[in-house]
Swiss-Prot record:
EC id: 2.7.7.6
Record GO cellular component, one term: DNA-directed RNA polymerase complex
Name of the protein: DNA-directed RNA polymerase subunit omega
One of the protein's GO biological processes: DNA-templated transcription
Catalytic activity: RNA(n) + a ribonucleoside 5'-triphosphate = RNA(n+1) + diphosphate
Amino acid sequence: MARITIEDCLKQIPNRFQLTLCATYRARQLLQGHTPKVDAKDKPTVIALREIAAGHVGIEMLKKVPS
């Protein structure tokens, strides 16, 4: 079972709303076939949160969102 906490992610992205948007966008990227930056044994949402907590993905995800 995945043991990732929101507190770990909030250390990287302090705004919980931006955190939600970043995790959502990254999870969608993973579903589209992008390569995970951490161990990929979990669902895309959990992988996205793990990447954020590890510092591999950050607020820059919001700048990549197509308008």
